[in-house]
Amino acid sequence: MKTFLGKKLWMASLAVALAAGSFAALPEMTSAAPSEPYTWKNVVTGAGGGFVPGIIFNESEKDLIYARTDIGGAYRWNPANESWIPLTDFVGWDDWNKNGVDALATDPVDPDRVYLAVGTYTNSWDKNNGAILRSTDRGDTWQTTTLPFKVGGNMPGRSMGERLVVDPNDNRILYFGARSGNGLWRSSDYGATWSKVTSFPNPGTYVQDPANEYGSDIVGLAWITFDKSSGQVGQATQTIYVGVADTAQSIYRSTDGGATWTAVPGQPTGYLPHHGVLDADGSLYITYSNGVGPYDGTKGDVWKLNTSTGAWTNISPIPSSSADNYFGYGGLAVDAQEPGTLMVATLNSWWPDAILFRSKDGGTTWTRIWEFDGYPNRKFRYTQNISAAPWLTFGTTPAPPEVSPKLGWMIGDLEIDPFDSDRMMYGTGATIYGTNNLTNWDNNEKIDISVMAKGVEEMAVLDLVSPPSGAHLVSGLGDVNGFRHDDLDQPPAKMFSSPNYASTESLDFAELNPSTMVRVGKADYAADPNAKSIGLSSDGGTNWYKANAEPAGTAGGGTVAISSDGSKLVWSTSDKGVHYSSTGGNSWTASTGIPAQAKVISDRVNPNKFYGFAAGKIYVSVNGGVSFSQTAAAGLPVDGNADLDAVPGVEGELWFAGGNEDGGPYGLWHSTDSGASFAKLSNVEEADSIGFGKAAPGRNSAALYAVAQIDGTRGFFRSDDGGASWVRINDDAHQYARVTTITGDPRIYGRVYLGTNGRGILYADPVGGNNGGETPPVSHSGISPQSTEFDLNADRQADIPVALTLNGNTLASIRNGNHVLVQGSDYTMSGSQVFLSKTYLATLSKGVQSLVFRFSAGNDATLSITVKDTTQVPLPEGSIRIEMYNGTTSATANSINPKFKLTNTGTAPLQLADVNIRYYYTIDGEKPLNFFCDWATAGSANVTGTFSALPAAVNGADHVLEIGFTASAGTLAAGQSTEVQVRFSKTDWTNFTQTDDYSFAASSTAYENWSKVTGYVSGTLQWGIEP
């Protein structure tokens, strides 16, 4: 996850001496604003949502496992509930860079000791030097030693490793391999002080991209490995190997405890060593790539060094000399229980998927986790269960040979449990995957891969809203788009899609019509020239559709606002200035009187009023964004952070938080006259984000929530009296580094939501507090997930695990209608987890099935299972086949968007102009209709749509959409397919009820043969059944 903090960063004065800073990580809070205890929890997404570059198993204690992230800190595995515990939430605003973890070492002699090398960037983005954090209680508390150079937890090569290691014979000794040409460093007092190993000859030469500031630094040392057999307990290990990011001489060895070093003779050259692992039999395995990762890598090899003879052997599953090698090698794991058993991962095989390779004979022969079985078909050695985070499909339905979800990408680290040959974990750009039956691979049985990231929440949050109805929270996120959070403690079933882009940069809802929402990001126009960077929702963020138009030539992004009644949009693009639309995004016109890249918001009462902020100036529009005028407001920050927000329910009331630490105004300002003037609050020294929530009992004004510094203390604060007084609502154990956004909840007094840059979304409530009228939630039992899928295809069937949160109750039964499932045959239990048998699931009918979990007390919980069948269906008679699914499957929607795949099953070319596809539906209120072709293989301009009423209404249909092609669409060769994605709506955008439509495919999420649409060639029915 490469996330640049686009804000001026605080620079604390850091000593460059090597002596340790002997202070606890959680100092006592100084006298400041009064505090109120809050309970803090992550909003659950279930997968993490960011890059996990390192997973580290302790070699001497089972189940002691750590994970490090690039911007979200470090975690420790909790075997009791198979989740991860965050260890660095104490990191605050000023020392935010400590959440970038470039290396982690767990002590193999004293398992209570653990060390982190922290620092986020080695360039100008990070003013702070790096540090070594050390703990004697497994990361519960930390002490810090500041280093005289920077550390790059979010820099290129961050999944190399580990750069920080503990001597397995004398655990007082640690080594750290630095970046930026700073070489090798050594500590002999448990990491308290450090000195440079001046005899080490090569600090590294490789630079990823000299022309780019982010990639222009020397990557440096990549990993360090001890040969434990060369030492004895209590004395320094004598033989040490170091991998360096250098394409000439990259592997160095010391045989005298680090006093002298030489390059290992005969070593391969030309590539960069990603990992080096020494097996118990004396074999040193090394993965190489022509890039340092995590995104690059187009060639690579795997080598083995016989450390006894000095012989090097190229053991690559697919060597770099092969035309089939289009990737490097990254992740490397050696089975401590079985010498000679190892695995490697591609870095990166983006298409059709990553590849894991496994060898049982030291790399002489390999098997791979998937292989082609008659292109485009693939044969899989695995099943994949994403029920813990169903959104990991990323909303895609790719055509073979691709599948969704994927095994992953950016697999720079892969580990086999040293105590359990069946357990393997690996990190990806989005989550941690793993298996508990790895050795099935060796018996030609499938391994079961599932998400193993419970507790990891690593997303970078760009925007949050809490509407007065619908879901309590909707998020805009970096890299994973965003979610509607219907249950804060359960993973969302899907991410935003249609439009689907990596990051939602800005999000808004209509205050007086909260189900109407808008979001913007940056679409991939290269992949889809018809893409749009703006999405709209009419159901509170459950479903989205792209606008029909956008400002000409824009790359998207920026900020967006919607009027209080939902009738008008104002979009400040990242590149083409500010534009407005009064046609629901069907057309856009440039606004006047406001500079490009201004931040825009809407008044929460007056539907014609919008505001903008740029370079210390406030702009207001009273005509729906058509024109803006600069107000007389003065004294606001010219640069730095800027958060302008309008108060719900009060026209013209604004708050502004912003400024920076480098000088100039910084703090919190208030306006009650639509931005004509602002008053600065004297009791707030610094502020970076402001939000609003339900008023306190007995109060009329909204509760205020701020990310701020008050009375010399940084934290999160609440004011119930319009900013006259503040209480701190976090403590020093819950700081979460840099917080990007804050908001309250308009329905729950005291509730606050935080968006962070790498620790996901947090929410909190007062401990034992009064929520101001909303009934506190009753503690019931629950299940996770609440929705999942099962494929009747025999090759893809797998048991479904369901985690129970019992809360003191017991499971009484599981029911499917009147049928009570039988434990032992229909399902099994292990602790608080249920495993639904694939044998039972295979008896279910296609469609949505509901299993009701009944407990000894409290409410039932329902698991919704979408049963599908991707088994090849015998084709009906005819020269064409039509597959279809609906892009929007909600019961009601203001647009219907079927997606078709048309295949020529005949033996001769087919003129597309002769083909007609019909979709049958009910009009649900006669109105004129609009037709849109969102995308088509043959070109959207070559697709036509015609509406007509049926001669007589039939069951499920009174109207039909006929889709045709122009002569310019050309021909479709025998055996080939073409795709058409269309959408239609009423001109007034009133809703259709889809559930009773003949052609509606309620449960399909990917292309399936669908007989309820019909296809004609030259007027003759060739596919489907007419209603």
Swiss-Prot record:
Keyword Signal found: yes
Organism: Paenibacillus sp
Name this polypeptide is given: Xyloglucanase
pH effect on activity, per entry: Optimum pH is 6.0-6.5. Stable between pH 5.0 and 7.5.
UniProt-listed GO biological process terms: cellulose catabolic process; xyloglucan metabolic process
Listed SMART domains: CBM_3
UniProt-listed InterPro entries: Carbo-bd_X2 (IPR005102), CBM2/CBM3_carb-bd_dom_sf (IPR008965), CBM3 (IPR001956), CBM3_sf (IPR036966), Ig-like_fold (IPR013783), Ig_E-set (IPR014756), WD40/YVTN_repeat-like_dom_sf (IPR015943), Xyloglucanase_GH74 (IPR052025)
Temperature impact on function: Optimum temperature is 60-70 degrees Celsius. Stable up to 55 degrees Celsius.
CDD domains for this protein: Sialidase_non-viral
Pfam family, one: CBM_3
Gene it is expressed from: xeg74
Role, per record: Hydrolyzes the glucosidic bonds of unbranched Glc residues in tamarind seed xyloglucan, producing XXXG, XLXG, XXLG and XLLG. May have a dual endo- and exo- mode of action towards xyloglucan, or may have an endo-processive mode of action.
UniProt KW DNA-binding keyword: no
Domain of life from the UniProt record: Bacteria
